């Protein structure tokens, strides 16, 4: 990828243009429309624009011709369709079918280039902010900005590390690639704000330990400086609670359960808010589109290109209840049948998916166009979406204001990047791994207080139960992937009654091979230290299950 791993000094950020930022740079706008490190050092307004660009870039469209490339939430969706709890109806409009079908996942395809280049451009945007602030001479506002730069860089590297790290699978237990090189625990190259041109051309994949230490250092700096922020701008920016949450994620990845438990609790306490209520989650106008209910999220505005495009955004793909979006046109989102069946009927979260006809939960489903009419002496919901959405279809992510007809309103929505609920589950899993029984108690307390007053678990695998409840809680938020890969969980799409498309019914023994992402060929070409040390291509590594 061009200029991905060059020093930011004197180098333009590939793809990070002023259109991705919320403020213009009047006195420092170059002819190319891009931002350089020197400009940031000399212009306060340029620095402000770069800081504003951090949350803005995550919502930006990578390529308007590739409708699956609408930013971080598109990458979240990529991870979701690689699991077995998230099912998409097979349809010609399904832009994400290659990832579900595990095809075109090798290093030479555009699909992989989107993920790789998007993350590294985000890293470079963070590097610009970090490099622009001298902490010894900075104002309080500048120190807060420095903390933001470190937090964003850490968050992006943590995602990349968990996606690109090669872990053993049933396809390649020896962890050797096509060249015979052992790639176990290798992640991706680390590009910092001080990396020079020469070093960038010989920048190897970091080991798990090297990457862990780097991210931990960034989060330590974020923790130190982010307290100087005066506002998290209505949860669109990370704050101290979010930094603690990122640390909890990091320590889980590193299997440091004591620290994961510690920082999950710090995140909960520092945030101070409560988990979403049933009314919050199932509201037909604000259900899972209200950023005030989360620790950190992304908020679309009418000025975002993703909104102006109408169909290249989170709501278009995540919400089944629109007449303008991709999902509403056919490739609707469902929960895997095996997951739905396992949820207790007394757990109110189960109503966020369409119940089978005749189920006692059918009447509890709410639709954005619900309308009760008398039919044969019985009041019946004559919602058109009730008829259109398939059984097990999602009712979780509502269009803004419940407006399913006008994209200019419906997609001016928000999506979550971190919720406090995740921290409760991290705390429970970490506790259970440290002292069996303690985590299950934490889970039971959470479930009975917030999700299912009648909750009881009588099984013998507490870790499995904690992870299951976590996946139900965070369904569609791009996070199940990480637990599947980290905890070596099998993916099971093929079984009697499955609602997966027959060609996507892959069953694995442990984590799937397709969850080890390949580094793109362009990086190999520009960076010899990576060449020959890439992850093996996992495309079509499994045959579909046949009934």
Locations of the language-model features?
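Flexible, polar/acidic helix-loop-strand segments at domain edges
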Residues: 345-418
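TPR-repeat structural position
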Residues: 212, 257, 436-437
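Membrane-proximal, proline-rich intrinsically disordered regions
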Residues: 23-77, 328-334, 339-357, 361, ...
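Conserved, well-structured interaction surfaces
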Residues: 91-167, 206-211, 221-231, 408-415, ...
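Short, surface-exposed recognition loops and adjoining beta-strand edges that mediate ligand/DNA contacts
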Residues: 35-38, 69-76, 164-184, 228-311, ...
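Bacterial Sec-dependent N-terminal signal peptides
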Residues: 3-7, 14-45, 215, 248, ...
């Amino acid at each position: 990828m061009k200029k991905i791993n060059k020093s930011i000094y004197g180098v333009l950020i590939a793809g990070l243009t002023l259109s991705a930022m919320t403020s213009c740079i009047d006195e420092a706008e170059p002819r190319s429309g891009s931002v350089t490190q020197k400009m940031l050092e000399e212009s306060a307004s340029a620095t402000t624009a770069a800081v504003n660009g951090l949350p803005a870039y995550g919502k930006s469209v990578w390529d308007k011709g590739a409708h699956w490339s609408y930013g971080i939430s598109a990458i979240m969706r990529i991870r979701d369709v690689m699991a077995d709890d998230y099912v998409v109806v097979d349809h010609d409009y399904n832009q994400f079918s290659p990832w579900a079908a595990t095809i075109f996942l090798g290093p030479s395809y555009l699909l992989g280039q989107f993920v790789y280049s998007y993350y590294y451009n985000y890293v470079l945007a963070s590097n610009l902010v970090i490099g622009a602030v001298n902490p010894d001479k900075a104002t309080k506002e500048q120190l807060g900005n420095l903390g933001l730069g470190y937090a964003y860089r850490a968050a992006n590297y943590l995602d990349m590390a968990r996606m690109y790290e090669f872990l053993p699978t049933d396809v390649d237990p020896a962890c050797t690639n096509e060249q015979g090189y052992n790639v176990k625990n290798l992640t991706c190259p680390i590009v910092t704000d001080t990396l020079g041109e020469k070093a960038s051309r010989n920048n190897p994949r970091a080991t798990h330990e090297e990457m862990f230490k780097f991210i931990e250092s960034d989060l330590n700096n974020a923790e130190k400086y982010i307290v100087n922020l005066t506002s998290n701008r209505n949860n669109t920016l990370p704050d101290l609670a979010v930094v603690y949450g990122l640390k909890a994620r990091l320590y889980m990845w590193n299997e440091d359960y004591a620290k994961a438990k510690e920082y999950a609790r710090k995140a909960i306490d520092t945030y101070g808010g409560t988990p979403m209520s049933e009314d919050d989650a199932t509201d037909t106008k604000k259900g899972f589109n209200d950023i005030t209910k989360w620790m950190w999220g992304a908020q679309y505005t009418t000025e975002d290109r993703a909104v102006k495009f109408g169909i290249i955004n989170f709501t278009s793909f995540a919400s089944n209840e629109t007449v303008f979006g991709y999902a509403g046109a056919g490739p609707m989102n469902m929960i895997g049948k095996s997951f739905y069946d396992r949820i207790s009927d007394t757990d109110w979260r189960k109503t966020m998916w369409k119940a089978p006809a005749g189920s006692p939960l059918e009447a509890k489903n709410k639709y954005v166009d619900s309308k009760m009419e008398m039919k044969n002496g019985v009041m019946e919901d004559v919602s058109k979406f009730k008829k259109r959405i398939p059984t097990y279809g999602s009712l979780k992510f509502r269009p803004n204001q419940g407006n399913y007809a006008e994209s200019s309103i419906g997609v001016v929505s928000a999506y979550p990047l971190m919720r406090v609920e995740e921290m409760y589950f991290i705390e429970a899993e970490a506790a259970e791994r440290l002292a069996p029984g303690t985590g299950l108690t934490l889970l039971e307390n959470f479930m009975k207080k917030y999700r299912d007053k009648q909750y009881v678990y009588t099984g013998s695998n507490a870790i499995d139960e904690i992870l299951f409840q976590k996946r139900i809680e965070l369904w569609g938020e791009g996070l199940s992937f990480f637990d599947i890969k980290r905890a070596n969980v099998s993916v099971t799409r093929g079984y009697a009654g499955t609602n997966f498309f027959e060609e996507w019914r892959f069953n694995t023994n442990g984590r799937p091979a397709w969850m080890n992402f390949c580094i793109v060929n362009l990086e190999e070409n520009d960076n010899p230290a990576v060449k020959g040390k890439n992850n093996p291509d996992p495309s079509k590594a499994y045959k579909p299950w046949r009934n």
